[in-house]
Amino acid sequence: NSMGVKIIFISDGDVLGVISVADPKSNIDIYLGTGGGPEGVLAAAALSCLNSQMQTRLVFQDDDEKNRAKKLGIKGLNIKYNMNDMVKGDVIFCATGVTDGNLVKGIKDVRDYFEAETFVLHKSSNTNKIIKNKIKK
């Protein structure tokens, strides 16, 4: 606190946490954490669409996880990955809220339909929007 630094600990939602860093209105400067590999790729996809950067390393809890990565064809088990190592080319990222969150609202039951919000990013078209959908029951 003496340095004017605010630290927020999150236990879940690492993809949203990473996306928040790219939002100039969030007042968040950096995200540090340990999460799953699939979540890291999703975060990289979103950040790629937002013209942001990230670096990561694989962290294994045990030899089983390391062996699984090898079976998936991952060769660089101990290297630093940049975003371009994780996602390439044109990227689309979509996230639909199931429950209410900071980014989108959760699914609502409204009379004869369900209402859902989806956050959509598309790199090549520079799309960044929230789409509201109505789905008939």
Task: Label each region the model flagged.
Residues 123-125, 133-135:
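Non-transmembrane, aqueous-exposed alpha-helical and coiled segments at domain scale
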Residues 1-113, 117-122:
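An extended, acidic
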